[in-house]
Structure formats: structure tokens, C-alpha cells
A protein has these predicted regions:
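Alpha-helical membrane-inserting segments
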Residues: 46-54, 67, 71, 123-127, ...
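Multi-pass membrane catalytic core of lipid/isoprenoid biosynthesis enzymes
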Residues: 29-47, 86-132, 136-137, 175-191, ...
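Solvent-exposed interhelical
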Residues: 146-180, 218-222
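N-terminal beta-alpha supersecondary unit
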Residues: 9-12, 26-51, 165-169
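Membrane-proximal soluble regions of multi-pass membrane proteins
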Residues: 1-24
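Acidic (Asp/Glu-rich) catalytic motifs at the cytosolic membrane interface
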Residues: 67-105, 212-233
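Membrane-embedded alpha-helical segments that form the functional core of polytopic membrane enzymes
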Residues: 34-84, 135-139, 196-216
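C-terminal ends of transmembrane helices
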Residues: 18-23, 75, 95, 149-159, ...
């Protein structure tokens, strides 16, 4: 029962998938971050369904672009937009954290979101779906969430409130770190075995950059910054996927 509730907590928080209502407590939140990658598995499965449907190329590209948004309800995009506004302000740490709390959408958020979807749609249109490509992308979507959850359990927090702090405080951080670190290594190995080593390399490099930006700019991570990392990693992994196909490596 606790296992199912733990999975339900992860899907309730990190997706738009309807789940039964129940009280969140210490027991069912302790390992919720370990279940976070399952949302990536669902995104990947639906992405593959979109790939095999007899759709016109533009509709398929739009599906590739929108499936993760529909599954997650845009929660990570919201963090991406807020973080783009904060980082583009070039203010001090307190100013950036204040911008992250502002519910309004600034000009830089709009510009970056438009640029993000333009780039994503363009790359998605270049993807030639095959079972191998579907498997690679599913692994990539799981990996980015494993790394995101690992960061929440391992990186310092920028503040003592908010989504990231709530899940970090409720988690058995040592166990979560160990589980997600092992999962990330296994996913990278699987990507490498399927010819997607470039995707794994991009994810790891962005994970290290994420830590640098979080510590240098904000003093730690926030829920918004976690969303920024996930969206950025997703877009940047799609680029080498396309490049490997163009180069005949997939």
C-alpha cells in the first residue's frame, strides 16, 4: 500500500495524471523522489505511441513536442520560465529569489518559452521514429528525472520553503541519493549500449552545470530551478538524438 501511495505522490506532484486522493505523510513521501522517474517512463511510452501512429509529419512533430507538456501539466515549464526571468535579471541572490516568488510572467520568460518551443518543434520534426529511437528517448526522459530527483536529495537548498525543500525534508535523503544515483548510472549505461552515449554525456554535463548555477547564482536549488534543469536537459538531449540520426549512427 505504501509503495502505491509513494508512486501516487510522485504522479500527483510531478504530473497531471489523476490519482486517488489521500493524506500525504512522512511514510508515503519518504521515497516519492525515487518514483519520480516513472513519470518519464509514461512520457516515453506516450511519445512512442505518437511515433507509431499514422500521423502527418507536422502533427507527429507537434505530438513529440506536446506529450511531455500534457503529461506533466507544465509544472516544469513553469519553473523554467520563472528561472529564466530570475537569471536574466542579473540581480543579486535576494533579487533573483524574489523574482522566483513573483507569480507574474516577465518578458524574458515569454521570449525563452517561445524560443524553447520553436527549437523543440524543429528538432522533433527532424526525428525519424524507430523502435531504437523510441527506446533511447524513453531512457533519456527517465534519466533527466532521476538526475533531477538526485539533485533535490543531494544539492543544498536555496531557501527553507517551497516544493524542493518540502520533498527534500520529507525524503530519506541517503537512500534516495543511492537509489537515484545507481539508476542514473544504469540508464547512462543503457543509453551507451544503444548508441546514445551523446545523450547521456549531455545530461551529465548539464547536471554539473545545474549545480554550478544553483550554488553560484542562488545559493542552492529551488523547485523552479529544478524545472529549469529538467526542461533544458530535455531540449539539449533532443539535439544529439537528431544529430546521431543525421550522421547515420542510429
Amino acid at each position: 500500500m505504501i509503495v502505491l501511495q509513494t508512486i501516487a505522490v510522485a504522479f500527483a506532484m510531478f504530473s497531471a495524471v489523476p490519482v486517488p486522493q489521500f493524506v500525504w505523510d512522512e511514510k508515503n513521501m519518504r521515497y516519492a523522489l525515487c518514483a519520480f522517474p516513472l513519470v518519464g517512463l509514461l512520457c516515453g511510452a506516450l511519445w512512442c505511441v505518437c511515433g507509431v501512429l499514422p500521423l502527418p509529419a507536422p502533427a507527429r512533430a507537434a505530438g513529440f513536442c506536446l506529450v511531455p507538456v500534457w503529461v506533466t501539466g507544465g509544472i516544469h515549464l513553469d519553473g523554467y520560465a520563472d528561472t529564466c526571468d530570475a537569471l536574466a535579471s542579473y540581480g543579486d541572490r535576494e533579487k533573483k529569489l524574489e523574482i522566483l516568488k513573483d507569480p507574474h510572467c516577465g518578458a524574458f520568460a515569454v521570449i525563452r518559452l517561445c524560443s524553447y518551443f520553436a527549437a523543440y518543434l524543429c528538432l522533433a520534426a527532424c526525428v525519424q521514429f524507430t523502435p531504437r529511437v523510441g527506446a533511447l528517448w524513453t531512457l533519456a526522459l527517465i534519466l533527466e528525472r532521476a538526475l533531477s530527483g538526485l539533485a533535490v536529495a543531494a544539492f543544498p537548498m536555496a531557501k527553507n520553503t517551497g516544493l524542493a525543500h518540502t520533498f527534500a525534508s520529507a525524503a530519506d535523503r541517503t537512500a534516495v541519493r543511492n537509489v537515484l544515483a545507481v539508476l542514473a548510472v544504469l540508464l547512462c549505461a543503457a543509453l551507451l549500449a544503444l548508441g546514445g552515449g551523446a545523450l547521456a554525456a549531455v545530461a551529465i554535463l548539464l547536471f554539473l552545470w545545474y549545480h554550478h548555477v544553483a550554488v553560484q547564482q542562488l545559493g542552492g536549488i529551488t523547485g523552479d530551478l529544478a524545472g529549469w534543469f529538467l526542461q533544458k536537459t530535455e531540449l539539449w538531449m533532443l539535439a544529439p538524438l537528431c544529430a546521431c540520426q543525421w550522421g547515420g549512427l542510429l
